[in-house]
């Protein structure tokens, strides 16, 4: 049973564990395991999101098709379309178990983690390069010319969680 006032502890612990697993996959260049983890994450978050507004079997089939195309075909339109729903699925999971104080603590701790991960240990940069190389990442892909930019999943997900908690509370 997760208490709203201390839910940030479990969420931060889960982020630390997931980061550790991601770094292990990176170290061993385990792209097949990364692909499986990515597929399952996309599938389940899409399933949760779609289940909110369609019959369960249709939600299951649509989540399966989109997760498969996103993971195995590298289509920018499917990738970005799925991202719009993935964060809604994450919000359905996390908003009910987080209160305003917890989400503020999470945002504060994530900001510190992000700074350390990008500027000090640089493991976030290594993870981003690994994900870009195998073309499996969380976030929006914005192509321009012969290049592309990425808006990371955390830049979408955390503000959505914050907004969801505020809507739930007030």
Question: What positions do the PLM features span?
Answer:
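A membrane-topology feature that recognizes alpha-helical transmembrane segments
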Residues: 1-170
């Amino acid at each position: 049973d997760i208490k709203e006032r201390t839910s940030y502890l479990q969420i931060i612990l889960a982020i630390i564990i997931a980061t550790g697993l991601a770094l292990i996959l990176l170290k061993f260049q385990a792209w097949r395991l990364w692909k499986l983890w990515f597929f399952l994450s996309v599938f389940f978050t899409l399933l949760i999101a779609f289940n909110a507004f369609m019959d369960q079997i249709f939600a299951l089939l649509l989540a399966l098709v989109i997760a498969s195309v996103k993971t195995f075909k590298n289509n920018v339109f499917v990738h970005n379309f799925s991202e719009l729903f993935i964060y809604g699925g994450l919000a359905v999971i996390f908003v009910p178990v987080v209160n305003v104080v917890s989400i503020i603590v999470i945002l504060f701790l994530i900001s510190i983690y992000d700074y350390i991960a990008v500027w000090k240990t640089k493991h976030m940069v290594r993870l981003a390069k690994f994900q870009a190389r195998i073309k499996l990442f969380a976030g929006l892909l914005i192509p321009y010319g012969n290049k592309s930019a990425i808006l990371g999943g955390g830049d979408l997900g955390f503000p959505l969680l914050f907004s969801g908690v505020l809507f739930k509370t007030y």
